[in-house]
Amino acid sequence: MKSSLIAFFLILTSAASGQVRKYANSFLNIGVDARAFAMGQAVVAQVSDVSAAYWNPAGLARITSDWDAALMHAEYFASIAQYDYASVATQLEGKGVLAVTFLRFGVDDIPNTSELIDENGNVDYNRIQLFSAADQALLISYARSSASVEGLSYGGSAKLVYRYIGDFADAYGFGFDLGLQYQRGRWAVGAIMRDATSTFTAWSVESGAFDEVFLQTGNELPQNNVEWSLPRLIMGGSGIWELDERYSLRTSLDAEFTFDGRRNTLVSSDFGNVDPRFGAELGYKGFAFFRMGVGNINRTLDLNGDRSYSWQPNLGIGFRYQGIQLDYALTDIGDRSAALYSNLFSLRYNWSRQ
């Protein structure tokens, strides 16, 4: 007990010397799976496939096949940035479900013009070199069903983060997500605590690579530092109805609670913020699905200083056949929010041992 208290206070002390940033490791908040995007990312209570490793690791326990795998590729900012996701989950023979997930958000082939001018003052384009700036994460997740409470499952994800900007700087970090799900009949509720212990990211700057350039241009030299992502709580509920022999309807409502200062969310204060999301899915014979969702509701300030609200509507379709599922989402229909619209595709395949 005494050693635990010492460790706890050491963590608090080191956290105080770092920087708490609202948007540290923001690439981890983009999301995965076109189905979830189409439903406004309101999936915390109902996710039950390999993407649960990201959305709510407790949902992994509801996977019924021996193996489940998924891939997604997306492009942002006129294809300048690439976002890739891959995940695989497997049953542990009655001892739970294990999943491994890889995420990468990066910009490649960036020209480095810091050495464009040679020592004689001449422009030499042969001195331009290309580099990449990327954020990567590896998630190792585990979940299992409760032996004492029917319908309850729990799980967690350990997150290993590696970020780099060419040879100029890189960072390592780690953190944990913890999740719960409870299902009873047609209803389900869920919750996930992202960055439950605060996600720690330590930056190391190779300052020698550009000290001279920074000093000549009057810029401040970057320093090594530590970033902390504070915990955020996402809670949600979901229900499903069989309309007839052919059609089913699922609806979901999630709310994300953040405690890192005032944000431009629907409900905001200095203490905390609430960001709601809603999604619906109409299914046809378990084969075809039409989805819609609303999220990213923000208070915006226009050029006249007047406040208004923006929101992001999403649509999508999906098809499932013999273990193969292909999903598509079009986000930000009609450019209702400040974000640009995106076309997202994801592929999922599940199979069992013979």
Predicted features along the sequence, with ranges:
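Sec-dependent signal peptide recognition
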Residues: 1-8
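Hydrophobic h-region of N-terminal signal peptides that target proteins for export
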Residues: 9-17
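Subset of outer-membrane beta-barrel
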Residues: 19-354
